[in-house]
Amino acid sequence: MNQEVMNLFNQQAQPQSFDQIKISISSPEKILSWSYGEIKKPETINYRTFKPERDGLFCARIFGPIKDYECLCGKYKRMKYKGVICEKCGVEVTLARVRRDRMGHIELAAPVAHIWFLKSLPSRIGLLLDMALKDLERILYFESYVVIEPGLTPLKERQLLSEEEYLRAQEEYGEDSFTAMIGAEAIRRILMELDLEGIATSLKEEIATTTSELKPKKLMKRLKIIEAFQLSGNKPEWMILTVVPVIPPDLRPLVPLDGGRFATSDLNDLYRRVINRNNRLKRLIELRAPDIIIRNEKRMLQEAVDALFDNGRRGRVITGANKRPLKSLADMLKGKQGRFRQNLLGKRVDYSGRSVIVVGPELKLHQCGLPKKMALELFKPFIYARLDAKGFSATVKQAKKLVEKEKPEVWDILDEVIREHPVMLNRAPTLHRLGIQAFEPKLIEGKAIQLHPLVCAAFNADFDGDQMAVHVPLSLEAQLEARVLMMSTNNILHPANGQPIIVPSQDIVLGLYYLSIVADGSVGEHKADDKNNPMQGVFGDIGQLEHALAAKSVSLHSKIKWRWRGLGPDGEPVSRIYDTTPGRVILSGVLPMHPKVPFDVVNKLMTKKEISAMIDTVYRHCGQKESVIFCDRIMALGFSHAFKAGISFGKDDMVVPENKWSIVEDTRTLVKDYEQQYNDGLITQGEKYNKVVDAWAKCSDKLAAEMMGRISAVQKDENGADKQVNSIYMMSHSGARGSPAQMKQLAAMRGLMAKPSGEIIETPIISNFKEGLDVLEYFNSTHGARKGLADTALKTANSGYLTRRLVDVAQDAVIREVDCGTTNGIKMRAIIDAGQVVAPLSIRILGRATAEDLVAQDGTVIVKTNETIEERHLPAINAAGIQEVKIRSVLVCQTKSGVCATCYGRDLARGTPVNMGEAVGVIAAQSIGEPGTQLTMRTFHIGGAAQIADSSFVESSFEGTIKIRNRSLAKNSDGDLIATGRSVAVVIVGPDGTERAVHRLQYGARVRVDEGDTIKRGQRIAEWDPYTRPIVAEVDGIVGYEDLYDGQSITETTDESTGIAKRVVIDWRGSSRTSDLKPAMLVLDQDGKPVKLARGSDARYYLPVDAIIGLDPGAKVRAGDVLARVSTDSAKTRDITGGLPRVAELFEARRPKDAAIIAEKSGSIAFGRDYKNKRRLTLTPHDGSDAVEYLIPKGKHIHLQDGDVVELGDYIVDGNPAPHDILAIKGVEELAAYLVNEIQEVYRLQGVSINDKHIEVIVRQMLQKVEITDGGDSDILTGDQIDRTELADFNEKLLAEGKKPIQGVPVLLGITKASLQTKSFISAASFQETTRVLTEAAVNGKVDTLDGLKENVIVGSLIPAGTGSLAADIRSIARRRDNLILQQRSAENAANAAELSELPPAAAE
């Protein structure tokens, strides 16, 4: 009995399970069915009694009682009257909680248009009626009448009439001869009378017959919305409201403040306005007030309802008493503070605490130190339960008292409770999944949380006052997940690139580096030629060595011989003698015993890179447990030796090179020389600037190299033994702290500085910090520092926003199946930039599955199809000299709604094949977004020291023989080979005949090699001036000018500072007289006729604006000589500042500012008639299809001449190509390769490594949609965009029925657009543009099937990824089985019925 009573009291609403959510426009009947009563008065509560007014906005009769089980007048109290309705005050006796979900309504005296369907672009009402929004507003806000039924009058249907026109028409045709109405009633009437089917049929006919370009698009839009209404079951007139719902009062509370005032939700003000105006309107109608007054009141009612739904969308924003705009219903959903992002996606949690972190070097990797006070508070319920179970307390109250008094037994119990109960630590900002990790708590005194030093890198934490939050996983499942998936020991590798993230840094690195140094001539070293003491410095076991170290008869750095005992390749014990040092032997003592981890792993100088590689080796071969133990051990070793070494530095450790001033003087002379050249008019101002900056950059580099040489050199003492290495060099070289760039500023020269605008200041800072800066230099250096700080603040926000968009677009990319079975793949090759291999093939294909057998030249199969390429395969692949590998990629994965494990490859954070249900999309987004923030925070570390962008030569990175493709080279007057073609490529062929590298040469480059030459590594292939683009003659002859008229298309400018004249092409399009000039330089023969080129056209070279002409008419010219040159922009510093916006631009698939123009087909070029201020260029394809025309702005430099032949995909105008063009011209694979390379380029510049597959996942999500080019036999319209998977499903059906399939081309969407076009409207609405998304979803009656992660978080169910994917799978299997059982049953029933009907009648009885 007792139990039942308790159950009655604690009746929780049972959570309902549902599979999908539908949204549609609500009908007036629906609104009334939700409502518990009409609200007739604007009053809220009585200010004296604090009781709600009857029929007011808080009415208890409508919305329910204020206190649990108590009516308003107090006649019925307590549980026993549950469900009774009080006859005096009309309140139902029930829980007060119903005030959170009971709604009311307001009956409007005049219909009102719903502002979302009217004003949210495109206006749905406008599209449906085919009327302009302006006209609709004039009708709705009572400015114009609309003709509804013209009758026999000459008026047209839906014609707008002003007041005068309406009255005139009534006089002219009689009052009853036509019907015209005004206001929302008119619109409602028109909407009700719409014949949707008829309109749809006529629209389809019109689309089929229309000839114009733009019309079908407009008609399609209208047809789409009409079909949406037909399919969704919404009625058009529902977009006009006759009833307004009122949300429950507890969701718009009114709270009394002290001092008799009230704080209220803005919604109450907005509702009050609506009720007041509605009641006034009712009264005016009853009083039969003049039309004009009623009309004004109706307009005000419309405005009040508009403000309630979406304040500020139309007209003035309605403000409250304090001039602050009121928050309407739409504002409640929108933005960061709206319902979606504030409450549904991010919730506050209990059982959490936060405190400052301090370092805990004696912790194990899986532990964290938790202050006792904090633990006591966090684990309270567990402690109460344990106290109760152990009999220390009989009631919770007693247990509470014991805990409050902090009795000794409580601490013992706390120890028990905490044992093996992991807690989660989180540091904001959580940029990737390693920002939350689980640890086992260890109780400590004090109030700060202790953190293990090795996990700092993952959290990006330091101990300068950072705070961290602790969360307690409560349920057993949560504890299990925390331990198995989130424990810090399970997160050794970085999900972005698969390298270890548990890597020692700073002190530890310094200690290990110190430990592994070798010093010549140290005490007790082994000398092979020492006859007196041949066994000095020879050691056989560790005990002997430790003894010698303790006795100081040998130092840590002495060269010794050492017998190492370990395991051979077959796992048998072996021993070998090594030349090494005692320090390295100590280090080898912590290595795990394993055949693949020999002594060579530690027998080298341990820099940070080497340590990382060592941890990686141990992890790959010995597994996770060994690695964790090993990491803890090397940490302890590193700390202890760093402290014993006692490394510190003073000012004398900063060694300034002796020849500093001579180098500086040389550069100064060079700069003077450039100034002189400029004064003599040999070079332009821009060129001088570039050269000066270049000279100083070189000087600065040279000095830095000198200084590094001095600092890294090892000095000898008087006994000929090595002195200790320079401390600063040790810190920098080991990777503990500081970089060569910072050392350069300390001891060489600070170098060039950048202005805030990004330009480099010509005068560098010659002093270094040791010498000190003078005032001017100090001032120059402040620019960079300020810019750094300002940038940081701005970019943190930008980077966070980029991450948010990436997560949103990729959140539903989850591993759904093991293998999708596709045979497609993408081709991978090494990335070579300016002859340097920046990403070798082996790194790019590691951990990916092959799409075809990988075969060596002798026919042996190295890796079979669909097998993952592991570390063990790489030596064979490299040995076989394979240049290109076809691998599986998510870009070609055929899995519906997700990706498959084979296409994805290895899970980088585990080093194993990826698990089912892994949320690879979110991991990809975090991997790309996290370094964005990191980098932006790093801009100011080198304090604006300028790094110059362009390289001006290309060197070979291989040995081999030279072949030249598309050869068009000429020897110029100086005897140099000059590339006179656009597509000249130098190919380096290896000894085995494979192409090792292909370098496309810059037009006008000086080529240093020729066909058949042999080339060595590091040899120059070609060089060019990075600051100018030349226009080069292709034949010998005499210079001629064409259309170059002084003052019209060419001008002689005299430089003020030098007095030298030079000829520059000016913008000739300014006046109509000169607009059709085509300034050009010609190469003429002896008769003064243009020389014919090999391809048949004249040697005529069109000049762009600002070209500087180098030769006079009549001058002799050799092929390869420069006729004119165009200065390019001066060198800007490259910094991720350019980087982050660039990444965003690529992911958003925006057209770059001056996009390249790419040839759509292979063919020949001809110049046509100019059009206004554009050049017309015609491309005649080789395949005989229609010619393509390009209009190019006149100032743009077109480097093609008449008659040039271009290949498909060649650039006609240089620039950054637009991704859409690449997709259209070269296809998906090329586009993906371009995006991956461009994005990687930005990150590589900053030294961040991200695996390609992450970028591929995002690109896959950007390519989800297909644009229909031919609807086939379906009812899908041409030009529609549909999902790839939908297209496949449609075509499957059509082909099965023997019909014509749909044709489509892939479309590239930017990440924002792609996020807003996901199938799930809940996900899209919680991302951006909430109003627009919800309006569209409601009109279409969309159903959200809750497939993605975000929707499930919002509705509060388990996400279908990770451990939640299992639950989802089980549910789907259960559903399938239920269906099978139902089918069987129905089949059995049918069979039984059939049997019964077959029985003879007598037997049936």
From Swiss-Prot:
Keyword Manganese among record annotations = no
What EC number(s) does the entry state? 2.7.7.6
Q: Which reaction does it catalyse?
A: RNA(n) + a ribonucleoside 5'-triphosphate = RNA(n+1) + diphosphate
Question: What does the record give as cofactor?
Answer: Mg(2+); Zn(2+)
Which is one GO molecular function term here?
A: magnesium ion binding
* Pfam families per record: RNA_pol_Rpb1_1 (PF04997), RNA_pol_Rpb1_2 (PF00623), RNA_pol_Rpb1_3 (PF04983), RNA_pol_Rpb1_4 (PF05000), RNA_pol_Rpb1_5 (PF04998)
From the UniProt record, give one GO term of the biological process aspect: DNA-templated transcription
Q: Which residues bind Mg(2+)?
A: 462, 464, 466
GO cellular-component terms in the record? DNA-directed RNA polymerase complex
Keywords in alphabetical order, please: DNA-directed RNA polymerase, Magnesium, Metal-binding, Nucleotidyltransferase, Transcription, Transferase, Zinc
The record's remark on the cofactor is: Binds 1 Mg(2+) ion per subunit. Binds 2 Zn(2+) ions per subunit.
- Binding sites annotated in the UniProt record for Zn(2+) 2: 820, 893, 900, 903
Residue positions binding Zn(2+) 1:
71, 73, 86, 89
SMART domains recorded: RPOLA_N
NCBIfam families given in the database record: rpoC_TIGR
PANTHER family membership: DNA-DIRECTED RNA POLYMERASE (PTHR19376), DNA-DIRECTED RNA POLYMERASE SUBUNIT BETA (PTHR19376:SF54)
* Subunit comment: The RNAP catalytic core consists of 2 alpha, 1 beta, 1 beta' and 1 omega subunit. When a sigma factor is associated with the core the holoenzyme is formed, which can initiate transcription.
Function noted in UniProt: DNA-dependent RNA polymerase catalyzes the transcription of DNA into RNA using the four ribonucleoside triphosphates as substrates.
What family is this? Belongs to the RNA polymerase beta' chain family.
Protein name, as recorded: DNA-directed RNA polymerase subunit beta'
Q: What is the species listed in this Swiss-Prot or TrEMBL entry? A: Methylorubrum extorquens (strain PA1) (Methylobacterium extorquens)
